[in-house]
Swiss-Prot record:
Species classification: Bacteria, Bacillati, Bacillota, Clostridia, Eubacteriales
Pathway: Amino-acid biosynthesis; L-isoleucine biosynthesis; L-isoleucine from 2-oxobutanoate: step 2/4; Amino-acid biosynthesis; L-valine biosynthesis; L-valine from pyruvate: step 2/4
Binding residues annotated for Mg(2+) 2, in chain numbering: 193, 229, 233
Gene: ilvC
Superkingdom classification of source: Bacteria
All residue ranges annotated as the KARI N-terminal Rossmann domain in the record: 4-184
Protein's recorded name: Ketol-acid reductoisomerase (NADP(+))
Entry EC number(s): 1.1.1.86
Length: 337
């Protein structure tokens, strides 16, 4: 991999995409953002969906021509797959693989299926990645406000010899070069992304919040107190870290809180936890996690669905819903309730 570099607007040229038709496969959170941003950057964009998709009319209402996936791929010279990881292989095999032409660019926003060999593209196409480091609605909002979400780009297969230029042009088209586009590889992006999700951002933080809440409840404290101290205030602390690192957070809290941070943090995240984190990373690197997740999907997701029901039924979720209902400034999405 080349030395880490950040690319901005002046480093990318939309002309690499000007004469190409871009097919966005999927019109969910990332799909709608990519399609709209590319279109408003002056590029020729169509949308590919399966017949009967609920997103079909939504995409049409935004002014896009919508086709079944195979027909969209046949027309396009650039194909971006923005489908859930677990669905990509099936749709690729059924509708994408045989409709790619020599010299096409096949894009991904996450390296899972390439890195774990679920999808093996033909040798005569470019295989590229643009991975925005933010959810689709933020990618869209930043673009409309004249900014952009930073992205990672990778070139897995460079048949045309222009893979880097095409990837950077795509990144510019969705606004990424406003925030900066950094180089990576499919391997690095996949392994670090999965580790971050599992050990820190999703698995780690949810388990930490639940453990703190349960500890206070078991000690006889009210559900409301436990929720506010272990869950509600999390956003305020994370916002400070997001804005100025841990230093700004520690500057902003009381000295008592800062002292508690120093003397207790490493008691919780101790050597045993760090050793377990290394095991988690190893399972990502050696493919164990991917194998288990793919098998879970092949068998109808029994453990996944059971755990989803259990977690949704936790007391902390019910208390949180009630308390958030008292906070008029929180715009809660009813579909998540």
């Amino acid at each position: 991999m080349e030395e880490l570099k950040v690319y901005y607007d002046e480093d990318a040229d939309l002309n690499y995409l000007k004469d190409k038709k871009i097919a966005i496969i999927g019109f969910g959170s990332q799909g709608h953002a990519h399609a709209l941003n590319l279109k408003e950057s002056g590029l020729n964009v169509i949308v590919g969906l399966y017949d009967g998709s609920k997103s079909w009319k939504v995409a049409e209402d935004y002014g896009f021509e919508v086709y079944e996936v195979a027909d969209a791929v046949k027309q396009a010279q650039v194909v971006m797959i923005l489908l859930p990881d677990e669905k990509q292989k099936q749709i690729y095999e059924a509708s994408i693989k045989d409709n790619l032409d020599e010299g096409d660019a096949l894009f991904f926003a996450h390296g899972f299926n390439i890195h774990y060999n679920q999808i093996v593209p033909p040798k005569n196409v470019d295989v590229l990645m643009i991975a925005p480091k933010g959810p689709g609605h933020i990618v869209r909002r930043q673009y409309t406000e004249g900014g952009g979400v930073p992205c990672l780009y990778a070139v897995h297969q460079d048949y045309t010899g222009k893979g880097k230029e095409i990837a950077l042009a795509y990144g510019k088209g969705i606004g990424g070069t406003k925030g900066g586009v950094m180089n990576t590889t499919f391997k690095i992006e996949t392994e670090t992304d999965l580790f971050g999700e599992q050990a820190v951002l999703c698995g780690g933080i949810c388990a930490l919040i639940n453990a703190g809440y349960d500890t206070l409840r078991e000690a006889g404290y009210s559900a409301e107190n436990a929720y506010f101290e272990c869950f509600h205030e999390m956003k305020m602390i994370v916002d400070l870290m997001y804005e100025g690192g841990m230093a700004k957070m520690r500057y902003s809290i009381s000295d008592t809180a800062e002292y508690g941070d120093y003397v207790v943090g490493n008691r919780l995240i101790n050597d045993n936890v760090r050793a377990e984190m290394k095991k988690v990373l190893t399972e990502i690197q050696d493919g164990t996690f991917a194998k288990n997740w793919l098998l879970e999907n092949q068998t109808g997701r029994p453990a996944f669905n059971a755990r989803r029901r259990i977690e949704a039924d936790r007391e902390i979720e019910k208390v949180g819903k009630r308390l958030r209902g008292m906070m008029s400034w929180i715009n809660e999405n009813p579909s998540n309730e």
